Amino acid sequence: GFVFITNFQDHCKREDLRDVSLTLKLAGETVRFPQEGTVTVAKNANIILPFNMDLDGILLKSATLQPLARITSEGKKHYFFFAPEGMKPEYIFAENTVKGGTKKLIPVPGFNSTVRLKSITGEEILITTLTREQALAACKVTVEKEEKLLITSADVLQEDAKVRIQSTDTILKVVAFPAVRFITETSAKISKKKYCSEISFIKKGVHIFPEVHMASERRFLVHLPEGAFRDVSDLILSIDYIGDTGAAFINGEMVADNF
């Protein structure tokens, strides 16, 4: 199951809720968040905490971490969680489901947090704990029938069996789980680690200089030079103006407006 926690309310003063603990009285057992002590629920937080969650044969009794994604790659299941702001992260497992009797795991969130666990039936899983900021930048994709989790501030586009990443920055960084084996972009620099790859691309900036003509007091004409879309996928026109409304037209057809 899942516990939903929110510390947000419109039109009200919000503040961190400190020294919080939650106890669930279930049929035949009691589950506490956290197992010992207390946590802080940050203001504006919306949190989902799991209990009695089956991780492919390993029973996660409780966690002060929010589930994010599960990918399957090379036949292995890889689970991703992230740490809500203000909460000390912990995983509590049912000892009789984990080989070696691991009961409690206190991770340090980040790209190097991946751990390997094996169930008593021999099934092996990976668990990675991310920060909230990293989770917000995560995107699940499929490449050559293998699932991957990409973490990047850029736009990620799934195009059939390929993935395209685009950004307005000249330096683009991506962290990929699991570690990648092949990238078609020759300018990529790859730092391969045990469970992930850190990939960076450096591209030359593209500079477009449009011609702008003032047709009237409230109307401007913008002409793009020939070849403006060479080496780019999109051009973004940003206009600062003072007024109630604005509208943009291409060949007489309105393509954007602003109120």
Stretches found by the model and what they are:
Residues 1-259:
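Non-catalytic C-terminal accessory domains or segments of carbohydrate-active enzymes
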